[in-house]
Amino acid sequence: MKAEFDKELIKKYDRPGPRYTSYPPATEFTEEVKEDEYVKRLIKSNERKTPLSLYFHIPFCEQRCLYCGCNVIISHRKGIEEPYLERVCREMDLVSQYLDKDRKVIQLHWGGGTPNYLSPEQIKWFMEEIRKRFEFGDNAEISIELDPRYLTDEQIKAIKDAGFNRISLGVQDLDPKVQQAVNRVQPYELIKEKMEKLREAGFESINLDLIYGLPYQTKESFEKTVEKVIELNPDRIATYSFAYIPQVKPHQQLLPKEALPSAEEKLRIFEMVINKFQEAGYVYIGMDHFAKPEDELAVAQRKGELWRNFQGYTTKKGVELLGFGATSIGMLYDSYFQNWKTLRDYNKTVDEGKIPVFRGYVLNEDDFIRREVIMDIMCNLGVEFSKIENMFGINFREYFAKELEELKEMEEDGLIKVEEDRIKIMPVGRLLIRNVAMVFDAHLRRKKELNFSRTI
């Protein structure tokens, strides 16, 4: 894929916007939607008999990475995690009592923070506690995020014994200057060694996370990182655009702002990334993922079954996601719920015997329609009008008359093509896919101030 950008086009489309891991985005959640609504929606979800996906947030980290946009607790003092895990078990009890026992878990993810902040014993114990409360389906996808700097041989064994079958390693960039600037020093040799040990342990699916747009990155420097990553031969690669939002994440103010690549340079970097990974045999998935052709993600994209949730792209469209732990987000078919963000609030609520939800959102009919359109854009690189019309009983061109008018400019700029029965994302538009999705975002139209990362 070769995409040419002129400076005017970059200037025109480089604006803040959501990443659409949900629609509406989490910025629309309201504190009026709390525990009682969650309980009601959990009970109602049993009628759908949908399988479950579980997310567990392990918020602890040994040190802060300056690019990080996650909700983390920095602590060198081990022991802080024990009472937290016990409370997460209590939260599971509070939630699982409302769920039919025959609903199988087909996907589980531990994120953070740093899940391998936990000791080998804690990893095994905590997974046993989860299995006591939930029934797992055959061939469930069980994944964990790992920080290679702190990963021990004992942890690798414990993770394998606990039943994990997918690994995600945070690499970000292999350039020493960039690593120092973002406070995450991890030499290539270390990543290579951990990858080899994970392969020896029998893990068949390993994902590497990269970030472009970090201080001191150039197309030339990041090309070296990409070449080394290709040598490591991961099954999947996620290449995220750095979300620089110092107004939301104050620690990002410690990054040298003058060393951040321009929007133009970021696009040069990502064009190189796309070309390099495709030349190496990876399939370009959605907005920012790459996978081997036989990988489930690539198969799902070919079948039009890709979906997005708060962990990014997923092959499990028809599942309902339950989030456990501080700050985690659950996604039922018709509603979203988020737990308290601070440990103090989370602990206090669980200790009172309440589900620790502090805000959420219940979708209306317009939200359902727009979510399907936006997810099709983000996942399937286009929208078929007839599909949306059949699902919701609307006339697409009438319902979205204003949006189709707005899209004419994007069509002139070569981002999309509006055909008889569909909107098709063109190669250039793929790099600006969030901008295309934003046209269909009814909530964004009402927003004055945008606390989102920039689209480029």
UniProtKB/Swiss-Prot annotation:
Pathway: Porphyrin-containing compound metabolism; protoporphyrin-IX biosynthesis; protoporphyrinogen-IX from coproporphyrinogen-III (AdoMet route): step 1/1. S-adenosyl-L-methionine 2 binds at residues 67, 113-114, 172, 184, 209, 243. Keywords: 4Fe-4S, Cytoplasm, Iron, Iron-sulfur, Metal-binding, Oxidoreductase, Porphyrin biosynthesis, S-adenosyl-L-methionine. Its EC number is 1.3.98.3. One of its GO terms (biological process) is protoporphyrinogen IX biosynthetic process. Involved in the heme biosynthesis. Catalyzes the anaerobic oxidative decarboxylation of propionate groups of rings A and B of coproporphyrinogen III to yield the vinyl groups in protoporphyrinogen IX. [4Fe-4S] cluster binds at residues 61, 65, 68. Monomer. It comes from Aquifex aeolicus (strain VF5). It is found in: Cytoplasm. The lineage of its organism: Bacteria, Pseudomonadati, Aquificota, Aquificia, Aquificales. Signal peptide: none annotated. Residues 46-280 form the Radical SAM core domain. Binds 1 [4Fe-4S] cluster. The cluster is coordinated with 3 cysteines and an exchangeable S-adenosyl-L-methionine. Gene3D superfamilies: 1.10.10.920, tm_1862 like domain. One of its GO terms (molecular function) is coproporphyrinogen oxidase activity. The keyword Disulfide bond does not apply. S-adenosyl-L-methionine 1 binds at residues 55, 112, 145, 329. It catalyses: coproporphyrinogen III + 2 S-adenosyl-L-methionine = protoporphyrinogen IX + 2 5'-deoxyadenosine + 2 L-methionine + 2 CO2. This is Oxygen-independent coproporphyrinogen III oxidase. Belongs to the anaerobic coproporphyrinogen-III oxidase family. Its cofactor is [4Fe-4S] cluster. The keyword Metal-binding applies. GO terms for cellular component: cytoplasm. Coiled coil: none annotated. Pfam families: HemN_C, Radical_SAM.
